[in-house]
Structures are given as C-alpha cells and as structure tokens.
UniProtKB/Swiss-Prot annotation:
Name the UniProt record assigns to this protein: Heavy metal-associated isoprenylated plant protein 16
Family (UniProt): Belongs to the HIPP family.
Record lipid sites (S-farnesyl cysteine): 154
Taxonomic source organism: Arabidopsis thaliana (Mouse-ear cress)
Keyword vocabulary terms for this entry: Lipoprotein, Metal-binding, Methylation, Prenylation
Residues cleaved off as propeptide: 155-157
Positions of region (Disordered): 73-115
Entry keyword annotation includes Lipoprotein: yes
GO MF annotation, one: metal ion binding
Length: 157
C-alpha cells in the first residue's frame, strides 16, 4: 500500500533540511521525500509500507524534534481518468527492430560444492566401535580442505 506521510520537523537552516531528507531517503520503503510547508519545516515522505513510527524516532535521534502531522493513502490513477487527447490520437505502429540475442558466456569454473563424506558402516556384531570411526573413504577429499589448481584455465579477476 503506497502512502504519503507528512512530518513536521524543527528545521531552521538548509543543513538541517538536507540531513532530514538524507535520513528519510535512507529508510526502508521510502520512494520520495519533499520539503513542504510555509516555513519549510515539514517533509512529505512517499513510499510503500513505510514504518512511520520508526522513521519519526530516527529523525528525532539524528536530526531534531519530529511529529507526525498526517498519513494519506495514495491511490493509483484509474483508467477512466485518461486525457481525451490521448484517445483521439491514432496509435502509430512502428516496425519492431529485432535485436540479436545476447548469449551469456559460460562460466569457466564450476561452483564449489561441499563434498559428501563417506563413512564406514557401524559394526553390528556388538564388539564396540573401531578406533578411527568415522573415517572418510578418500583421505584427500576431506571436508574443509581446500582444493588447489582444480581448473588451471580458471582465472579470478
């Protein structure tokens, strides 16, 4: 849900206004910030699902005293509200230019995958646990051990 939030902040100079706008723009969900009001002491924040309480608390901490003035839901324009000039103009059909398909280069390296250890089965004869249980079948394929020069043609840039 897109909404407009009007916040009054104790701003007296351009430095404070810039700091307030910068703080508001960095907040999650904010799309646009405008300075409003007769004394340029209000900002209008437009965004999708903006947490206004957290925004006001952040502005209070970083800039100056801030208070919520109003919150309004922004409705998208309806299709029936189109200008009549747009409906009268015939649509010109332009021939579509075919773009050559872009081929993605194949990666030179395979992504790293964690090797699965292979363990010897548990002895079911009841005589205890072997001294080196569990041990991997291949001692060179241990988990966490780096593999050097796996593909010599691969370059990391």
């Amino acid at each position: 849900m897109k909404q407009k939030i009007l916040i009054r902040i104790a701003m007296t100079d351009d430095t404070t206004r810039a700091k307030a706008m910068k703080t508001a723009v960095q907040f999650k969900g904010v799309n646009a910030v405008e300075i409003k009001g007769d004394h340029r002491n209000q900002i209008e924040v437009t965004g999708v699902e903006v947490d206004m309480i957290a925004l006001i608390n952040t502005l209070r901490k970083k800039v100056a005293f801030a208070e919520l003035v109003s919150v309004a839901k922004v409705e998208p324009p309806k299709d029936g509200d189109k200008k009549p000039e747009e409906e009268k103009k015939p649509e010109e059909k332009k021939p579509e230019e075919k773009k050559p398909e872009e081929k993605k280069p194949e990666p030179c390296c395979q992504p790293w995958q964690k090797p699965e250890p292979c363990y010897q089965p548990w002895p079911h004869d009841g005589y205890g646990v072997p001294s080196s249980y569990p041990y991997p079948c291949d001692p060179y394929n241990q988990i966490g051990e780096p593999v050097y020069n796996q593909d010599p043609n691969c370059r990391i840039m």
